[in-house]
């Protein structure tokens, strides 16, 4: 009778071990599935962030390039205006400058 009892206890232990192994395997599988899902979600977030960052960069690049062209045009206009002002000023005072130079060159001092 004692051997039947021992035999039953061994069978119970083996069954418990098999059940525990199934529980451990199920937990391991669930953990791997959660890790895989987390990895996929992280990769998706990274891709979205990267796309948004690239879009922001391209937008800013276009804005600064457009500003650069506008700045060049504005500077050219300002330069042309300034050159025209200087030409007008030079033509206005050139007669006086020529007279002053002639006076100094032709005047003899003792």
From Swiss-Prot:
GO CC annotation, single: proton-transporting two-sector ATPase complex
Molecular function GO labels: proton-transporting ATP synthase activity, rotational mechanism; proton-transporting ATPase activity, rotational mechanism
Main location (coarse class): membrane
Lipid bilayer topology: Peripheral membrane protein
Localization (cell): Cell membrane; Vacuole membrane
Pfam families per the UniProt record, alphabetical: V-ATPase_G (PF03179)
Keywords annotated in UniProt: Acetylation, Cell membrane, Hydrogen ion transport, Ion transport, Membrane, Transport, Vacuole
Protein origin, superkingdom: Eukaryota
Disordered, as annotated region: 60-80
Keyword Chloroplast: no
Subunit structure of this chain's protein: V-ATPase is a heteromultimeric enzyme composed of a peripheral catalytic V1 complex (components A to H) attached to an integral membrane V0 proton pore complex (components: a, c, c'', d and e).
Functional note: Catalytic subunit of the peripheral V1 complex of vacuolar ATPase (V-ATPase). V-ATPase is responsible for acidifying a variety of intracellular compartments in eukaryotic cells.
Name of this protein: V-type proton ATPase subunit G1
């Amino acid at each position: 009778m004692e051997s039947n009892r021992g035999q039953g206890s061994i069978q119970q232990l083996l069954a418990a071990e098999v059940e525990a192994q199934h529980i451990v395997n199920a937990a391991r599988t669930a953990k791997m599935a959660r890790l895989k899902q987390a990895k996929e979600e992280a990769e998706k977030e990274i891709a979205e962030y990267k796309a948004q960052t690239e879009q922001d960069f391209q937008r800013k690049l276009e804005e600064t390039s457009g500003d650069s062209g506008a700045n060049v045009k504005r500077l050219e206009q300002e330069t042309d205006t300034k050159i025209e002002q200087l030409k007008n000023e030079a033509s206005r005072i050139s007669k006086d400058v020529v007279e002053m130079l002639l006076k100094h060159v032709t005047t003899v001092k003792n």
